[in-house]
């Protein structure tokens, strides 16, 4: 067992008879597997060693997307979170190493998208005398034409000091205008109990600035509902925030106590009430959409990077990281395509190439199917008349009989000696 769970809770009964690799020892995974196969139980949980090197071998789920972790750990001490117990304080990877990793992924390995990730993207560099904009400016320099970068989750406190710089980066033509800022609650009282180190006003300051300065920005956020100290009034504040911004991506989480965390010692809200609040916010989220009917007919340039679950469409994103589906027959993975929106759903827009006329449809096997069936029927009827039931046409299909008779006459003329013509009636 490797990762956060084994590091944070190694004494759990179900972990007693397995080998464990902590988050600071992940570069020794091959060694641990080898010892385990020999029948030895290994437990590597040391915290005070340097972090595993950034350039460990990896296997991409999507060969077109490089997921680059820029740091490990965080600067916060949220009362509900157990990740800090496993990953510890912030450790930022060196700027030069990250830039080289990105350069190699783009130029040597052919990826088309770079996704930056960490426990808190905005905190990068604060332990090494740098700030996130320093890294982002260097990364955009190595992004080739036709490729894009997407920023991961960043908590409000560490973006407040750099609103102008972050907006500038998000407006860069090779960076998606996408920002994931988890608010968790819109109640200042609950945020204080969570030790989130910001207020609702801080979050709104960020959101309002980005909306005003980054055209068509896509803002995603998270909510934790039924935190032990959340009142109905607190919950309503969170509902009001969702109504105000209508977040296109909203990750709704019902609070669950994590053993060993300060919040786990607090009295839980009744389960029925917790589910009621979760259902209410989920219903609110379903009641609106970014993709309205008014958007049908819009033109977009999208980068297609994967196949949709229906296996009929390619999944692409425009500059605002809006999801746009394109019929697979028109897609080439890793390339851009100009499309026109033809339909909308809650989570995406459906499109076809802008070069296709309104009444023009792609040629596919489905379009040839009726013709194939018709031809098969004719062949079958011809075979029945000729080999199984002579006179079938005359008896059952008189409207075809004359045509068939003409065909027989033509055949007889073809094989008869032309010097002694015979006429058939």
Swiss-Prot record:
Ranges for domain Radical SAM core: 60-295
The protein's required cofactors: [4Fe-4S] cluster
Cofactor comment text: Binds 1 [4Fe-4S] cluster. The cluster is coordinated with 3 cysteines and an exchangeable S-adenosyl-L-methionine.
Membrane topology, from the record: Single-pass membrane protein
Gene Ontology annotations for the cellular component aspect, listed alphabetically: endoplasmic reticulum; membrane
InterPro entries xref list: Elp3/MiaA/NifB-like_rSAM (IPR006638), Methylthiotransferase_CS (IPR020612), MiaB-like_arc_euk (IPR006466), rSAM (IPR007197), rSAM_horseshoe (IPR023404), TRAM_dom (IPR002792)
Protein name per its UniProtKB record: Threonylcarbamoyladenosine tRNA methylthiotransferase
